[in-house]
């Protein structure tokens, strides 16, 4: 059976649960060809107005152990995990400020030694001030950052046991 590949006149949603797993006929949304069914499709440079997203999971990017400096990179995800080197201060360099961009950094202490510290260049913190990173071995602080296009604004919660 031929499957139509134009939905320009559609007035209601098409429930994905009713699509056959072999429904891989490309359709065009804007300038992007999309295939439905058991495929993964990446939509680039597309504006969606008032979408509803369900069952959304962000990619977690394991940075690993950081030493005296590290430049944060958001190209592969916006939930980052890093472990501080024992008794070492790490200076984190922020990515370029893009309006509406945000990310979370799960910052852990080394499991046995702890004692690492961190600073973040160019971040505006709330009235409580710049965080003093939890130094207890094995503990974790969660730092959240959001940008207005000019600045990065940071907030934090501390002392978690992962």
Predicted segment positions?
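Extracellular "spike/adhesin" assembly and maturation modules
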Residues: 1-36, 41-42, 161
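Glycine-rich, flexible loop/turn motifs
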Residues: 3, 10, 68-70, 129
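Short, ordered beta-strand-loop transition motifs
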Residues: 8-9, 135-137
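Detector for repetitive beta-architecture
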Residues: 33, 40, 45-50, 79
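Exposed extracellular interaction/assembly regions and N-terminal maturation sites
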Residues: 48-120, 124, 139-141, 146-162
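Beta-strand-rich interaction surfaces with strong enrichment in secreted/lumenal proteins
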Residues: 92-93, 130-134
